[in-house]
Amino acid sequence: KRRRGGGATPRPPAPAPGVPRADDAGARAAREPARSTAPKGIATGHTPVLAAELLDLLAPAPGQTVVDCTFGDGGHARLVAERLGAGGTLVAIDRDPHAQARFDALAAEVPCAVRFIRSGYAEALEALGAEGVRAAAVYFDLGMYSMQVDARDRGFSYSYDAPLDMRMDPTEERSAREAVAEWDERTLARVLRDYGEERHAGAIARAIVRRRSERPIETTLDLVETITGAIPAPARFAGGHPAKRSFQALRIAVNDELGQLDRALPLAWSLLGVGGSIAAISFHSLEDRRVKRFLAGRAQGCVCPPELPVCVCGREPEAELLTRRSVTPSPEELAANPRAASARLRVARKLREEETG
C-alpha cells in the first residue's frame, strides 16, 4: 500500500544496543506531552527551560551516551546526567570558556562519566562523528543562557550599559563593536532584516553609519540610543524594547548562530543510533523554522508526484516526530521563569539509518 509523508508513521525497528525504545504508554504520551512546571532545586541556581518535557521525551536511561550541545549553565545536563547513572556518559559542548568552570563543578557531583568539549557545537559534533561516537540522544538549548545575559561585561543585554561585545567565545576575532564599526550600511541593514526581522532595518543601519562617523559606538547604551533614535516614535512603544530585534540580529551574526545550527543538525542526526532521539529548544522563529524543516524532512515518506497511483520512489521516513506541534512552557513555568516565554521544543526519534549512495 502506498505511503506518503502525511500518512501513518511506521513502527520503529528494534533500537540499537544501549538505545532503548520507550514503552507504548510513554510513546503515546510523548506525541502529545502534557505541559508541566520546570524542576526546581537545580544546584547551578539556573532553572532550565522545558526541562520536564525534555526529560519526558528524550527518556535518558542508565548506560546511555547523551550529547548536550549547549551546556551553558548546566541545568539540563545535570538532570540528564542523574538519569544516566554510573554506566552512562554525558558529553557536554560549549564554546564559552566560562562554561568550563560550571562543568567542572557538575562533573564532581554526577554519577555518570562526563566529557567537556570547548568548541562550537557543529565542529564538536563533527569531531565526535569522526571518533565513531554513537549517542542515544542529542539535544540543543539554543540562544543565550542566563549567565551570559546577566554578565554585564559580555554586552549581550540592552538593559544596562556595557562594552559592546556579544561574543559567546571571547577569543573570537570580531565583536559586535567591530561589526557596527566596520560593516557597510547595506550589510548592516541585511543583518538586521534577516536575523532580527526588524521592520526598520534600513533606518537603523543609516543611523549607525551616521553616528559612527561622528563618534564610535562602543557600548550597549551607545547602540540602544542610536537604534531608538532611528525608530518612529509610535513604534518605540510597541512590541517590546525597541533595540530587542537589533541586538538579536547582531548577536546571531557575530556568533554565526544560524550557520552553526544548519551544520549541526545533520551531524547530530548522524550520531544517533536507531531509536535515538534529537531535541531542540529554540527561542525565536529563525531557529524554530530550521529545526522544524530539518525534522520534517527526516520524517517525510513518499515523494512521488500525486498523480501516480502507487509509490515508485520507495522512500521511507527516517524519523518519527514525537512533537507534532512545538511544546511550549506551562503557565506555571512562565510564572516562575518569564524568560521562558518564547521557548519552543521539538523532538524526533530515529527510525533507521540514512540511505547512502
Regions found by a protein language model. Give the residues of each.
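S-adenosyl-L-methionine-dependent methyltransferase catalytic core, i.e., the SAM/SAH-binding region
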Residues: 1-357
